[in-house]
């Protein structure tokens, strides 16, 4: 650059000409662009540049159950820039990833109207983390009604441990019950089987936290493989602590035995005399079953369409059993009240003989509850 003499500068100044200042690029002229993950795991990314324009890099942040929309100028701001947009700035900036929750598609139920999504758990979370304690309680063996309706009946040879269920950290989001063949008692838990216990497993439920009355209730599960496994997705009446079983009612939406992996069954259990706390000679049940795929080889959907005085049990979109208040073997229909959800893998005779496996897994993708035929309520306790 040519030097301008002092005399020339003085002449220009006297003539009223503004003289621009010229500053060299120094550290003070370096700006930073900070990219924030905003609501998901990940480390913020900082880019330093002396330029006043910059092309944003392809987003590397991910958030399970959400799709990336672009970048905002504040954590709750509107979209300001698209992915890989070129931005212009005169000072350091901080941009926040903008996310939109991915909503599941409504299931198709023949002859029925599925309404709004009322509640769901997609089981998103870091690998090995616990299930959502706002919704679920992991149980130990304890036959008190306050303990998830009572656990480890039927001479089931397992210790239930809350630690035996955890999230797998996958993009899809799963809760996994790991059942193990063991040869020594674990440090925690109780065995209530009179013949002794040989397995550890898990059971968790929404008792005292979330209850449901009517609607379309659906889960997607890959069932455990091997004899002795006894997985189930089911419900008990919320009033079990006051009226007991079977008067409270039991809905087995999906129940399987590991020795018959192609058979899925479901049932209603109820009272024959309508008397509270009168177990167990007054108990009866109705059930249905469906033989289909190997349910332990892949994921399948299990659902219940529940409206006043009617329950349809469904596997992979196929209604395999319908119960009504006039079709069951008792006048005491207990299924027009709030119920809570239970997911477990028991072990026992229903699953057949042990087939020498050392570990099995029941993988639960989601649980979703929709309104059905304008019926459906969720109660957050």
Q: Where is each model-derived feature located?
A:
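Short linear motifs in intrinsically disordered
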Residues: 22-27, 299-303
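Generic alpha-helix initiation/capping and coil-helix boundary signal
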Residues: 1, 6-8, 90, 156-157, ...
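Secretory targeting and sorting signals
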Residues: 1-24
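GH16 jelly-roll
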Residues: 101-381
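Secondary-structure capping and domain/repeat boundary segments
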Residues: 25-102
């Amino acid at each position: 650059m040519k030097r301008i003499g002092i005399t020339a500068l003085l002449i220009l100044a006297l003539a009223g000409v503004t003289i621009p200042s010229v500053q060299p690029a120094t550290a003070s002229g370096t700006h930073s662009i900070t990219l924030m993950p905003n609501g998901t795991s990940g480390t913020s990314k900082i880019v330093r540049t002396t330029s006043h324009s910059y092309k944003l890099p392809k987003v590397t942040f991910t958030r399970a159950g959400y799709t990336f929309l672009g970048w905002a100028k504040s954590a709750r701001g509107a979209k300001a820039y698209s992915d890989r947009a070129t931005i212009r700035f005169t000072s350091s900036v901080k941009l926040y990833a903008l996310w939109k929750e991915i909503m599941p598609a409504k299931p198709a139920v023949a002859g029925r109207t599925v309404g709004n999504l009322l509640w769901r758990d997609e089981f998103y979370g870091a690998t090995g983390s616990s299930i959502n304690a706002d919704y679920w309680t992991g149980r130990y063996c304890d036959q008190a009604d306050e303990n998830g309706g009572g656990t480890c009946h039927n001479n089931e040879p397992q210790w239930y441990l809350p630690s035996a269920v955890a999230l797998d950290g996958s993009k899809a989001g799963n809760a996994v019950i790991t059942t193990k063949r063991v040869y020594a008692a674990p440090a925690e838990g109780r065995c209530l089987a009179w013949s002794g216990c040989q397995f550890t497993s898990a059971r968790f439920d929404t008792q005292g936290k979330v209850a449901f009355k009517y609607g379309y209730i659906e889960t997607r599960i890959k069932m455990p493989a091997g004899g002795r496994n006894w997985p189930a997705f089911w419900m008990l009446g919320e009033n079990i602590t006051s009226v007991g079983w079977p008067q409270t009612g039991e809905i087995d939406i999906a129940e399987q035995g590991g020795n018959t992996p192609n058979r899925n069954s479901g049932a209603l259990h109820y009272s024959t005399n309508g008397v509270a706390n009168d177990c167990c000679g007054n108990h009866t049940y109705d059930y249905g079953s469906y033989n289909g795929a190997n349910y332990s080889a892949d994921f399948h959907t299990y659902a219940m369409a529940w409206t006043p005085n009617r329950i349809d049990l469904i596997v992979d979109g196929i209604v395999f059993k319908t119960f009504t208040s006039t079709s069951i073997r008792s006048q005491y229909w207990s299924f027009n009240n709030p119920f809570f959800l239970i997911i477990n893998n028991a072990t026992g005779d229903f699953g057949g003989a042990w087939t020498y496996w050392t570990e099995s897994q029941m993988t639960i993708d989601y649980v979703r509850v929709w309104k059905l035929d304008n019926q459906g309520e969720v109660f957050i306790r």
